[in-house]
Every structure is written in structure tokens, then in C-alpha cells.
């Protein structure tokens, strides 16, 4: 649903609250990190999350954008969590990066599906990575045997096996 995607994109520009001095949305989102103070990143993120969750339309628009994929992957009998969350990664800022992980490691149901909606074209380290199934089995075995103590070491061990997803705006 292109109109819902545009609505979400415009919502974020307004929620961010920084004057858009760029000629288009893609340039705005690709350069917003230049206007952010990394030490205030979590406060910035929480402010946007609060705006998202205060919006009467955001969840509906988000669902409309993702509905074709959600229906295909999990069917049409779904429940959406009450609160939408947001992750922000800043270029060259290790403190904002998400380490190699599975949401189930922190108690999330293995039956939950997470939707990532890119507001710009993403590739390489601007994207998200996945680990092929055969390597995932190896990773699970290593974790089960407690051979690696933290996600940083886990990342180093599997870095060469990661597949970075190329994904376009709204895909």
C-alpha cells in the first residue's frame, strides 16, 4: 500500500522534528544522522517511539504496508502488539548497532514475526544480516555448549558467513 508507506515516511519526518533541508525524503533520511547527537540517541529514539504509539493511525498504516507479506508468511489471522518499537543505527557508531542475536534469546516467542520497514534503500552494513540455516545450526550448538561468552565474539566467529540483505525503500 504505497499511500500508507508515504504516510509513514511523512510521519517520521514530522516526528523527527528537524527541518528537512534536503531535496527529497531519501536524502533527508540518509543524512539525518548528521543532525543527531549520539549521546542523546536513546532519548531521540524514545521520543519518536512515544509519538508513534500516540498516533491513532500509525499501527493501521504499518499493517497496511506489511499486510501482503504478513498474510503470505503467517496467514491473515494475526495480532499486532500494542506498542510499536524503533531501532536506530548511526553510521560509524558501535553503540547503536544491534549485535548478532535472535529475539527468542531475550524471551520473545518463537512464533512472533518482526517486520522491518526500511525508509531508504539499504545494503551492506546499512542493512540487516542473516545467517544461512547450516551455519545457524552450528551457532546454536556453540551457544548451547557455552563455548562463546558474548555476542561480540559470536559475531567475529560468523562474520564471514553473514549474508547482508539488499533491500529497497518500503520493500
Predicted segment positions?
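N-terminal auxiliary "cap/dimerization" subdomain that precedes the catalytic jelly-roll/cupin core
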Residues: 1-77
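Generic, low-specificity signal for short hydrophobic/alpha-helical stretches with a mild N-terminal bias
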Residues: 30, 48-52, 82, 97, ...
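Amphipathic, alpha-helical segments enriched in basic
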Residues: 37, 41-45, 75, 90-94, ...
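Active-site periphery "cap/insert" segments of enzyme catalytic domains
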Residues: 60-61, 88-91, 95-99
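A short coil-to-beta-strand element that immediately follows conserved catalytic motifs
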Residues: 76-85
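Ordered hydrophobic segments in well-structured contexts
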Residues: 85-87, 129
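Catalytic core of non-heme Fe(II) oxygenases with the double-stranded beta-helix
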Residues: 96-169
Amino acid at each position: 500500500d504505497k499511500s500508507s508507506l508515504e504516510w509513514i515516511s511523512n510521519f517520521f519526518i514530522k516526528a523527527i522534528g528537524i527541518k528537512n533541508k534536503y531535496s527529497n525524503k531519501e536524502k533527508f533520511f540518509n543524512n539525518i544522522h548528521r543532525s543527531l547527537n549520539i549521546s542523546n540517541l536513546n532519548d531521540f529514539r524514545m521520543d519518536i517511539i512515544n509519538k508513534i504509539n500516540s498516533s491513532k493511525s500509525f499501527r493501521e498504516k504499518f499493517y497496511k504496508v506489511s499486510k501482503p507479506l504478513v498474510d503470505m508468511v503467517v496467514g491473515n489471522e494475526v495480532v499486532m502488539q500494542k506498542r510499536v518499537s524503533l531501532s536506530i543505527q548511526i553510521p560509524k557508531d558501535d553503540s547503536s548497532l544491534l549485535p548478532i542475536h535472535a529475539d527468542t534469546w531475550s524471551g520473545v516467542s518463537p512464533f512472533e514475526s518482526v517486520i522491518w520497514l526500511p525508509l531508504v534503500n539499504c545494503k551492506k552494513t546499512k542493512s540487516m544480516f542473516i545467517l544461512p540455516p547450516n551455519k545457524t545450526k552450528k551457532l546454536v550448538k556453540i551457544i548451547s555448549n557455552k563455548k562463546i561468552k558474548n555476542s561480540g565474539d559470536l559475531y567475529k566467529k560468523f562474520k564471514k558467513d553473514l549474508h547482508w540483505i539488499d533491500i529497497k525503500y518500503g520493500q
